[in-house]
Every structure is written in C-alpha cells, then in structure tokens.
Amino acid sequence: MNNKLVKLIALLGLSINVASAEAPEVNGNLGTKFSSDYHRRGQLVSQEAIQAQVGFNVGLGGVDVFGDFFTNQSTSSDGADNDELTVGLGNSFFEDKLSAYVGIYNTDNSESGDNLEAFASLGLDFPLSPTVSVYRDTDDSLYTFEGQVSYGVDLEIVNLELAGILGNTDVSSAVDSTYFGATLTATKTIKDNVDLYADVSLSDNDTRDNETLWGVGLSVKF
C-alpha cells in the first residue's frame, strides 16, 4: 500500500472523529468465493481464483462511511493476484432518491503494481437502480467511466439478480477500451445473515471476443 493511500485513509479517519461524537451504527459483511476467471474492467486478471472480501458501513451524523477490501488469489500458474481497497463517504438526498459517494480506490496487482484512483458515484432509487461512476488516476490523467443497472426478483426458493455494466477506461494516454459485462446471480439464505450464491457472467470488450465466467460463494452480514 503506497504512502499516498495511507495518508488519505488517516485523513478520512480524523475527519470521522471530528464530524461526530454520536455512537455510530456499524454494519459489516464478509465472504469468500471460487471463480472460474476474474475480469476487471473487461481485462482478464486471472483464471481459477479464490476470492475473499470484507466490508463495513458506518452511519455518522447522516453521512455513511464505507470501506471494502477484496483479494483475488490466482490458483493457476499464469494468473495474477489482485488486491483492491475502497474507502469513501456517502450521503442520500431527496428522500433517499439520490445517493452520492466520493472516495479512493487502490489496486495492487502482482504483475502491474500499485495504482490509486479517486472516484465519485451517483445512484438513483429508480427501477433498475442506475449508478454512474467516474474514476481518475491520481498520478496520471487517466479516467474510467462506468454505468451500472440491476434488477432483482424474489422467487421464495432463491433470489435472482441480473446486473449489467458498461464502461470505458483509459489503458494509457493514447489507448482506451470499452467494456461490457452482465451477471446473473442466484442467492439462497441458509441461515440468518448467511447466504450461499452462484453466478454466471458474460464479459466482453472491444479488443476480444466475449467470455463466460462462473463462480460459487458464501457471504455473511453482521
């Protein structure tokens, strides 16, 4: 983790302490998953990977403070390991119809190294739950723009969710890539706050043919 990221997280923690002396409402989640492949922004990171994730959300004086750590550990000889850390602040407006988020997103890849981005997102409490996000590399003027939608249905036996993503990312100052993804997830609650799920995804970008990915995982909320 680079020094810039450490300083930003420390500053965020200081602002949280100053902003509110109230007892915070804390929620968390963790999970693990086996995935046939891991794609990030339309690019293959690794095949056959074990993934783990832990996250938190703290409500302080009307502001949500959130963080998430995700790791992808390749089990194949030609794959890369990837660690991703997200920390940010969010708030809701217009009777929770509009949500806004800002934060930092750090990726550490075993082959390409460490990269830190700032991001801003807007989400709408409308059908399909549309969200738009923009990311900017803190060292170079490289941008990523993403739009996401999702739709869920409760079938009693399982919950189904279909999610789609469309984005464009600057690979370098001279090259960009447009990518698309769609994921269908089936989730079964096996105990209070414990879910078992399976998903299948389609991943595509403008430099290759589309690929199909799948995974199975377990998630816990607390």
Region roles according to the model:
Residues 2-5, 13, 17-222:
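Outer-membrane beta-barrel proteins
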